[in-house]
């Protein structure tokens, strides 16, 4: 086998390896993208639900404040003031819990995305190792054949 023939074989083999790398890399990237999109979609849905709860809590505080302002007698104003303070305390507490839950959801999503990124990077490293091994095996087989000839 001539040097030119060996170079032709290696060029063809490199093209095959590059096509395989491109295909598998594309699969890895698509799987990663789907995971990240699913994480972000779930996060958005959960946050939207929590924001609705928060808005309801704020609306309840506003209703109590309006009732206090619109009270017609001093006695009723005092009662509405007490009610408003109670409602405000409860709803502010609820809002703090909601904010904390949103922060926790974001943290968990960030960790999940980091795990997906690490998994993707690991799969890409494995792919590179497999392709390198195939390349090295082909080079060895060509050298062995060259020695036999």
Predicted regions and their residues:
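The feature captures the hydrophobic core positions of alpha-helical coiled-coils
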Residues: 2, 6-9, 13, 17-21, ...
């Amino acid at each position: 086998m001539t040097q030119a023939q060996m170079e032709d074989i290696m060029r063809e083999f490199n093209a095959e390896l590059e096509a395989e790398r491109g295909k598998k890399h594309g699969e890895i990237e698509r799987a990663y993208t789907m995971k990240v999109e699913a994480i972000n979609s779930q996060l958005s849905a959960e946050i939207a639900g929590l924001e609705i709860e928060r808005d309801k809590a704020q609306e309840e505080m506003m209703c109590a404040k309006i009732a206090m302002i619109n009270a017609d007698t001093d006695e009723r104003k005092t009662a509405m003031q007490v009610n408003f303070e109670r409602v405000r305390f409860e709803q502010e507490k609820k809002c703090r819990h909601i904010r904390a839950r949103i922060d926790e959801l974001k943290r968990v999503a960030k960790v999940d995305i980091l795990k997906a990124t690490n998994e993707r990077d690991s799969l890409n490293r494995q792919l590179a190792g497999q392709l390198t091994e195939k390349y090295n095996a082909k080079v060895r087989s060509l050298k062995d054949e060259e020695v036999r000839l």
